[in-house]
């Protein structure tokens, strides 16, 4: 058995062993545990013995030897059988055949089957079953060009009549308009709450509340035009040109916007009234007013915008007699038709005091929801006219104001 080519110290330190062959047997005589190799330079410098150990035989077998032994079809049940042979040598079931490493027994006959007796592990198994036909799965491996019959992708009609797709509410234009009207009413109420906050700056044309009043009025007018437009796609038994639920929602949104217009006028009126207080009071408190000539000019433009929006809503509400044919009011008690209310006839409409008291919650018994709604609709032209008068009064007040 030969010695290693590196000394034990260099192998332990995992460095290269440097030797001087000229110093072979003189400085390192042969002795037990030592070889005839010359000592390495590292051991000489360290002053230690340079020892070369003998090579040891490795007990690990190579991968090729393991594979060759495991797949050797030699003895199957002997003591030298590999793990693969021992695993395959076990029967698949009780009383079944043994399977060897060459898998040759797989094509043999199973004991007990076909001999007239039942197999212990297959009680109840039909031994007369026919083998699978080779052509049974031919369609699975058919060429691409072979006509194997089209696969139907049509929805099944045996689902009890229910739609296979879920209904999308966003596709319904009526629901979309209803959502827009609800959002407009909420925006108007939030704007009115902001207008009554204390210590707020005077309104201008670019104030958020004024911008919302302009945008929401344009949106409401566009929705009202859609509601009153004829629906040519309506093929129902009772065709109508107006969706009544949307009409009531639009009227409710109109009332919110009119209330917002009135709140804007009230905010301007409060600012103007604050300037009529004695100047001595402001001098004692040391406060200066934010309302000046520039604010008055902004007030004038805001009021002109409100007047323009009211006139536009008038034209949209009372477009023509033909567009109001489905909005003509019917008397609850007699069922007779009444003339549509237009701006020209608005001043001649006099609401019934009894109905107004009933709507206000007095002791007079109310006539029902229809009577209340009819009274509200009849007062819409009067509300517009009163709002115009308030705007004109504010404009006149600012013309004679001392802030110019």
UniProtKB/Swiss-Prot annotation:
InterPro entries: Carb_Metab_Trans_Reg, Zn2-C6_fun-type_DNA-bd_sf, Zn2Cys6_DnaBD. Residues 7-50 bind DNA. Its main location: nucleus. The keyword Nucleus applies. It comes from Penicillium sp. Transmembrane segments: none annotated. Transcriotion factor that specifically regulates the expression of the gene cluster that mediates the biosynthesis of gregatin A, a fungal polyketide featuring an alkylated furanone core. This is Transcription factor grgC. One of its GO terms (molecular function) is zinc ion binding. Residues 61-82, 147-177 are annotated as: Disordered. It comes from the Eukaryota. Residues 147-159 have a biased composition (Polar residues). One of its GO terms (cellular component) is nucleus. Residues 160-174 have a biased composition (Basic and acidic residues). It is found in: Nucleus. Keywords: DNA-binding, Metal-binding, Nucleus, Transcription, Transcription regulation.
């Amino acid at each position: 058995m030969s010695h290693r080519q590196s000394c034990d110290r260099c192998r332990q330190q995992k460095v290269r062993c440097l030797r001087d062959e000229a110093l072979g047997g003189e400085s390192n005589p042969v002795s037990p545990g030592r070889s005839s190799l010359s000592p390495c330079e590292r051991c000489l410098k360290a002053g230690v013995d340079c020892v070369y150990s003998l090579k040891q035989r490795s007990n690990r077998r190579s991968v090729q030897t393991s594979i060759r032994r495991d797949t050797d079809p030699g003895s199957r049940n002997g003591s030298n059988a590999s793990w693969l042979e021992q695993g395959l040598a076990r029967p698949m079931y009780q009383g079944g055949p043994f399977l060897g490493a060459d898998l040759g027994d797989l094509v043999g006959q199973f004991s007990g089957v076909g001999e007239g007796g039942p197999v212990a592990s297959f009680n109840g198994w039909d031994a007369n079953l026919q083998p699978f036909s080779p052509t049974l799965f031919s369609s699975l491996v058919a060429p691409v060009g072979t006509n194997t019959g089209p696969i139907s992708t049509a929805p099944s009609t045996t689902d009890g009549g229910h739609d296979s797709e879920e209904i999308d509410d966003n596709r319904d234009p009526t629901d979309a308009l209803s959502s827009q009207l609800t959002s407009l009413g909420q925006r108007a109420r939030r704007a009115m709450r902001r207008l009554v906050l204390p210590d707020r700056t005077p309104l201008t044309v670019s104030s958020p509340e004024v911008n919302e009043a302009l945008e929401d009025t344009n949106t409401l007018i566009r929705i009202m035009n859609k509601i009153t437009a004829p629906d040519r796609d309506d093929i129902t038994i009772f065709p109508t040109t107006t969706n009544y639920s949307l009409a009531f929602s639009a009227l409710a949104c109109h009332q919110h916007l009119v209330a917002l217009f009135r709140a804007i006028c009230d905010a301007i009126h409060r600012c103007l009234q604050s300037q009529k207080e004695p100047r001595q009071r402001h001098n004692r408190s040391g406060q200066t007013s934010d309302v000046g000539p520039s604010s008055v000019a902004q007030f004038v433009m805001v009021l002109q915008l409100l007047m323009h929006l009211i006139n536009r809503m008038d034209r949209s509400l009372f477009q023509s007699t033909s567009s109001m044919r489905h909005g003509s009011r019917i008397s609850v008690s007699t069922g007779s038709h009444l003339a549509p209310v237009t701006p020209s006839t608005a001043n001649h409409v006099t609401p019934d005091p009894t109905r107004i008291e009933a709507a206000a919650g007095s002791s007079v018994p109310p006539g029902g929801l229809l009577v209340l709604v009819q009274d509200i609709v009849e007062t819409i032209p009067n509300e517009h006219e009163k709002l115009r008068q308030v705007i004109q009064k504010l404009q006149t007040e600012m013309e004679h104001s001392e802030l110019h």
